[in-house]
Curated annotation (Swiss-Prot):
Keywords: ANK repeat, Cell membrane, Cytoplasm, Membrane, Nucleus, Repeat. Expressed in roots. It comes from Medicago truncatula. Residues 4-138 form the MSP domain. This is Protein VAPYRIN.
Amino acid sequence: MDRLIKLDPSNIVLIRVEEGQKCLGKITLNNVMYTMPVAFRIQPLIKTRYTIKPQSGIISPLASLVIEITYHPPQQQGSNNLPHSFPFSDDSFLLHSVLAPGAAIKEPSSMFDSVPSDWFTTKKKQVFIDSAIKVMFVGSQILTQLVEDGNSMDDIREVLEKSDPLWESVNSKDSQGQTLLHLAISKTRPDLVQLILEFKPDIEAINSVGSTPLEAASSSGESLIVELLLAHKANTEGSESSVFRPIHHASREGHMEILRLLLLKGARVDSLTKDGNTSLHLAVEEKRRDCARLLLANGARTDVRNMREGDTPLHIAAANGDENMVKLLLHKGATKYVRNKLGKTAFDVAAENGHSRLFDALRLGDNLCAAARKGEVRTIQKVLESGGVINGRDQNGWTSLHRAAFKGRMDAVRFLVEKGIDLDAKDEDGYTALHCAAESGHADVTEFLVKKGADVEARTNKGVSALQIVESLNYVGITRILVNGGASREGLGEKPPSAPSKIPFGRKVESGSVMTMKKKMSSRTRALRGSFDHSMPLAVL
């Protein structure tokens, strides 16, 4: 026989450490003797740290007794009152047990802490001494400190596994309101996050500032942690109490991979912050061009005005003097004439901040193109003198020369060419000003451009030359001008690519020269610009 008492459920006593609560653990002593009572005594080696109730007693044959072990944390000023070693304590306990034949036990409690100490001296009896009792500290304070330290994954796992499920230890918070997930994220530890997620924490629990774990990870740029949280069904919209949602954090901080993950998981691209900013506002404010581009590709609206100033993203880009961001927003359809709560357009904001390089894109380019379209040479001159860019383009690649040539404004064409405008600039479909003049039937403009050195062999993206266009329209005079100017007739017998079935870019065809041109068209299949003119450019880049 090597022992008289069996420890249940094991030799490890779990003592739960919680702020403001008694640190208490329990262990059951089972008398394994069938016929005789057993006397016991438990003593901690460091008696000031623990109180044991009962410390001694007599257990009837095959009976059990629950022992309470209370831990007294250190009471030091400025200390976190954690045990000196955890989760497994270095402290030792001695369990003495001895047979007590003939002991009369009328009421078991009457024998608690009343067993004479000399019963446990080996001089009188055979005393069994067991030092197997060990203390393991569990609870919120232990777990949060283990995660904060991050040194032992095994210890964290063991504490979580041994904790009573009713305690919900996996949702423990530290004194600052940080959950285990928040702490692991702050330590940039995806391995810890993975471990904690195995125990099914409240994945939407907020910390003291109202942020969910996903919001915290999105802000800190931890893409792997974000991916883990999303895989465990974290809400992409975050908490209603927080100022920023996950998509706002990612956009503001420039975390492209996280932004992409959130959008793939259905995050609302135009969700608002507490002050009414969208993710696009934040990306523009912080000059996160890649994030802005991704948001726009996913349908972000460019016309949303925030709550405080009533600014659109374009207002913010203009205030920052961010030329590339302005061009990006305009290319994606931002309206430049929206006014904020102070009645200012993006141009006004750029002007008051001294960002003159934005003037062309935000207003002067429009004025230049409008003047060219109308043939107003004086206005063209004033715009250029005010800083307008002569080779400025709108979002479809049109220059003022394209407009003037298409409308047949000879004086405007001549003035622009004399000022050095690019004769052979192409729009995004590959049309030059010569294509425009030829297609719209303006022989004088066509001849002038040819004489000034315009490339008569220039072809659109579909391989169509100006000569092919006028041949298909039976413009004999313009055909002669182009041929005399050096245009090759080679390949004219081939069928040119068919025209698009609808107007590209949603632009409006004017009823003047274009409708007249359509009446002159032959029945042959042809490739025509057909939609070159429009009343107001959306952007000049």
